[in-house]
Amino acid sequence: IVVYTSDQGFYLGEHGWFDKRFIYNESFKTPLMIKWPNVINAGTTNKEMVQNLDFAQTFLEAAMIDIPNDMQGESLIPLLKGNSDEWTRDAVYYHYYEYPSVHMAKRHYGIVNKEFKLVHFYYDIDEWELYDRLNDPNEANNVYNNPDYKDVVEKLTQELKEMRIKYKDSEELDKSFIY
């Protein structure tokens, strides 16, 4: 198996930022290419939502090693074998909490699916953002307070709460580890 991936990209002024720690697309998306002869057909592409949390489970399964129950990712093996119908993830969770720090990126967490991105900035502020990824791929127009998106906000807020529980993430945890 040959895997090519990278760290996320830097902002070069997009969204008024330099650096890389925000949930916006410029630093949220990372490249991932895998070559696995006799398993992955050459030229195959996939648009499913995967994340670096999935790499360890994937490599363990490929090596036929038991996957510990406390790992948070999901093996990419079904996707690599072309079995997208076995893939159940339709959204990913993100949390950045190292503020204040040299980077000065505000603490925030969010949920991202193929259509929308919901973000909550917290700690010394309480701001929400919602982006319609299909109609606003540059994430330039925050539609969180737009009444047309009320149902989307409610649905994603509930899914975000569920993901925070799934990953055992909370403000209480922040208070324990972040000063």
Short names for language-model regions:
Residues Q8-E14, L53-A56, E61-E129, R133, ...:
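C-terminal cap/loop subdomain of S1 sulfatases and analogous C-terminal strand-loop tails that border
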Residues Y24-F28, E48-Q51, P68, Q72, ...:
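Short acidic-hydrophobic sequence patches enriched in Asp/Glu that either
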Residues V39-M49, A62-I67, A140-Y149:
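Active-site rim elements
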